[in-house]
Amino acid sequence: ADDELTLRTSTTWLQGIERELRRRLYQWRHLPVDMIMDDYIACPKVVHSTGLGISEDVDIRVTDQNSDIYSRQFHQQIACLQDVDKIKTPVVTYDREATEQARHVMAGIFGDILPVRVTGLKGKWFAPWDELIRWFGVEQAMTDLIDRPELVHSAMTRLMDAKLAELDQWQALGLLDRNDDNTRIGSGGYGYTTDLPGINLNPKQVRTENMW
């Protein structure tokens, strides 16, 4: 890429900002197609979650050292109905101070080049089955759908209840943001539409009904 994507910053946080900008500029120069550029730099709200209480136990096999895509073998962690209790309901917190610190630093970097805008959650990718197989293993999950459907249904119900509770917390804490804009929706479309945000919009308290 003729050094266009080479990072110059040193900290992980700044590298994340630089990487996004370099990729955006690279696409604009070489592959613009119907690309849209925002007229601001987004400073995401700093949000913490305790998570689901269970994470994948996995063996990996790397075939390309330059790629973050690799083969995985998941070890089963939900093998009986009692194991479903391992799935916990996340507790969400908003770190307002850390968000303001990040905004201040970014404003100092970009100055009058681009305004910095604090943004909330414009959407989170969530594929329930993709999450579940990390705890069952792909083959075991498919087998259990036939041999022990009550186990899979129980785990899926628990997972969905937990994620919906997390979504409710995002909304209650004012963390959601409109995504009827230059936001990737689903598998790749822009969020622009005249049907959103709808008539019941409070700009300071965006609700799920105002979003994709």
Regions found by a protein language model. Give the residues of each.
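N-terminal basic, low-complexity leaders that serve as flexible interaction/assembly modules and, when applicable
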Residues: 1-82, 101, 108-125, 165
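Generic intrinsically disordered, low-complexity segments enriched for polar/acidic and small residues
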Residues: 67, 71, 84, 187-189, ...
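Residues forming anionic-ligand binding surfaces in small-molecule and nucleic-acid pockets
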Residues: 76-85, 135-139
